[in-house]
Structures are given as C-alpha cells and as structure tokens.
UniProtKB/Swiss-Prot annotation:
Cellular-component GO terms for this entry: nucleolus
GO function terms (MF aspect): ATP binding; polynucleotide 5'-hydroxyl-kinase activity
Record-given protein name: Polynucleotide 5'-hydroxyl-kinase NOL9
Localization per Swiss-Prot or TrEMBL: Nucleus, Nucleolus
Functional note: Polynucleotide 5'-kinase involved in rRNA processing.
Length: 368
C-alpha cells in the first residue's frame, strides 16, 4: 500500500452505503445532518459524505457547527464552506483549512458559554445557504448541504442539537452510535414531537471500530491538541511558498514577519462573552488571537468575520496595533471590528527554546 493510501481513513461498508443512500436520494435539496457522541467519527463520515456527493454534484455546501473542532477553519468559528474538489485526497494527518463562503467568530470552543448567540449564528448561516444556494432560480443551482455537529449530546448540548434539527428540517439525519449505549442519542426521530408533521430519512450507523486489517481504529482525540493544530495550520498560511515544517520555524517566522499596522482609532473592540475594564483593554489584546470583522458587510444584522489575527504588539503612543494575519491586504483594509474571545495562542508557540521572539516567547528574568 502506498504512503498516500495509508493517510486515507478506512470507510466501513455500512458508512459507504449510508453515504450512497444520501447521494442517490431523489429529495431536493439534499440536506444531511450528521450527529452522534464525541469520538464517534462524525467528521470522518461527513468528509466522506462530501466526497461521495461530489461524484454527483459539482459543489457541496458544508455547514460546520462544531466550534471546538471545526473541519475547515480555526477553532471558535461557525462557518459555511463551499467545497468544489476532493478533500479525501488531502493528507488526513494535516488539518484542511479553506476560506469559508460565510463565517462568524463565536470566540469559544464550546456553545455552553452563550447558547443563544451560538444558535443565532447557526440559523443565520443556514438562512444564508437557503438564500444563495438553495432556492431555485434561473441563476442558481441547488447545492446539497452537509451539516457537521458537535459531540456534546447531553444536557444543553442535546437541547441545542434538537433546536438546530427543528430549524433546518434536514432531508436526511445520519446518527452514529457507539458501544457505550448510555452516551448515544435517543432512538428514532428524537427531535420531533407528536405534533410535528415534518419527517426525515433517519440513517443509523455504528462507529467504525476496526480497519481493513481488523485492527482497532477508535482514537480518543486530544481536543486541545487538535485545536492547537488547527490554529497552527491557519497561521501557517501567512507563509505560503516557504518551508515551515516545525513549531520552532513557525515561531521564528511569526516573530520576524512584518505585521500590519492598524490604527486603533479605526477599530471597534468587541469583547465576546465578557466585560473588560477600559483600563485593561490594551493589556488584554496584547499577544492575543482576535477575529477580524467588517461591520459594513452584514447578513441579518451580523457582521462578517474574514479571519483571525495575532496582536503581536501595541504602540499606545502612536495608537497602532501590530497584527499578523493571513487575510489579504484588501480585506484587512476593510476591517473595523476586533472580536476578542477565548481562543488562545497554542502554548507550543510560547515555549520554543533557543529563540527569543517578542510577544511570542516566555522570556522571564531570573530572580536575584
């Protein structure tokens, strides 16, 4: 087996049949929501489903509602991405970063902190999909939609999933079950009550336990590590064309990279989920990850977010923020909102030895 094949996931026959059932459906548009407990394989199945749909459609819409481990963006985002080429051909050991069609910066890795804001973002992204890619007209072609969901399926997480299911009314729901029965979602069309006239094609499959060699493939992901990898993959885009293969190389490049100078007077700073005293605003921004928003580009009164930036330094005398971001200059010039949440720089970028990088290294003077 080739090295490339080794990097592809094993797709069980049951999963292949489920994906084919969705793809071959006569229902239009195809709106497939994938749900199940954490570590059940939702992301893997969703990516495979996109691949199967691309065999029939030129493009597939992907609505990612998992703010902790999103598929195509850095953590903290809710996004709608249009996929027009194979994603299974990419190396599955490396996070796949794509530019979304529309995204919002929620600013945390769990919907627990602000469920109402979370639902509003999800609903707005779905409305955007319906308006631009679903409703039939002479100039529009309906795109199938795959919705990936978080693995938090108990308590508030369960209630949020039910709310999303009722709002989007999917044509297909793929429910992945694991061996720990008490961690699974309820049986049947659990999100519908007796008064609902709507229905959906429910497909229940088992989590993939073994590969083609009958070896266990259950991987308990380190959530923090996965988030750090996605943040690293995102900011590596600042250095396209350069060989940046190690954490040390990335830290060096980030520290030496020429940042954008952004006048503080041109910005509105929005602290998500918390209140920051005015005397500590600059201190809180320094060496932080922020969402870059454009207030003039709104949909349903929500400003768009064009990406993330690292505030590498602040010149309070000149009133300048120094920001590193892979966002193109023509978009950075439009940014007038800084959205600060709880997405943090990976500690590995702060602890690289043998290199002193201002704001990106822990340089502590020894006590005397």
């Amino acid at each position: 087996m080739s090295e490339a094949e080794n990097k592809l996931p094993f797709i069980p026959e049951e999963w292949s049949n489920a994906a084919s059932s969705v793809s071959c459906s006569s229902l239009q548009p195809v709106i497939a929501l994938v749900c199940g407990p954490k570590n059940s394989g939702k992301s893997t199945f969703s990516r495979n489903l996109v691949e199967v749909l691309l065999q029939r459609y030129k493009r597939v819409a992907y609505l990612d509602t998992d703010v902790g481990q999103p598929e195509f963006t850095a953590p903290g985002f809710l996004s709608l991405t249009i996929v027009d080429k194979s994603i299974l051909e990419s190396d599955w050991t490396v996070p796949c970063v794509k530019t979304p069609e529309r995204c919002f910066f929620y600013g945390d890795v769990s919907s627990k902190r602000d469920p109402k804001a979370y639902l509003r973002y999800v609903y707005t992204l779905f409305d955007y999909y319906q308006l631009h890619f679903c409703k039939s007209s002479e100039n529009k072609t309906e795109l199938p939609l795959v919705i990936n969901t978080p693995g938090w399926v108990k308590g508030i997480g369960y209630e949020l999933l039910v709310d999303v299911l009722r709002y989007v009314s999917p044509s297909h729901v793929v429910k992945i079950n694991i061996s720990a029965y008490n961690k699974n979602l309820p049986a049947g069309l659990f999100w519908l009550d007796g008064n609902d006239d709507e229905t959906a094609h429910l497909i229940e499959i088992q989590s993939a336990y073994q590969d083609r060699y009958n070896q266990s493939i259950l991987i308990h992901k380190d959530a923090r590590l996965m988030r750090d990898m996605r943040i690293i993959a995102y900011f590596r885009q600042c250095f396209k064309g350069k060989e940046v293969n190690t954490i040390k190389e990335l830290t060096h490049e980030l520290a030496s990279h020429i940042p954008y100078e952004v006048p503080i007077s041109s910005l509105t700073i929005n602290h998500l989920h918390c209140q920051i005293p005015s005397s500590e605003v600059y201190y809180s921004l320094n060496a932080s990850i922020v969402g870059l928003g454009i207030s003039t580009e709104v949909f349903e009164d929500l400003p768009s977010c064009v990406g993330l930036g690292i505030v590498r330094g602040i010149d309070t005398e000149r009133g300048i923020l120094y920001v590193i971001t892979p966002v193109p200059e023509n978009l950075v010039e439009k940014v007038d909102l800084l959205l600060q949440g709880y997405i943090q720089l990976p500690t590995c970028l702060l602890e690289v030895k043998d290199y002193r990088s201002p704001y990106l290294s822990a340089n502590v003077l020894a006590s005397t």
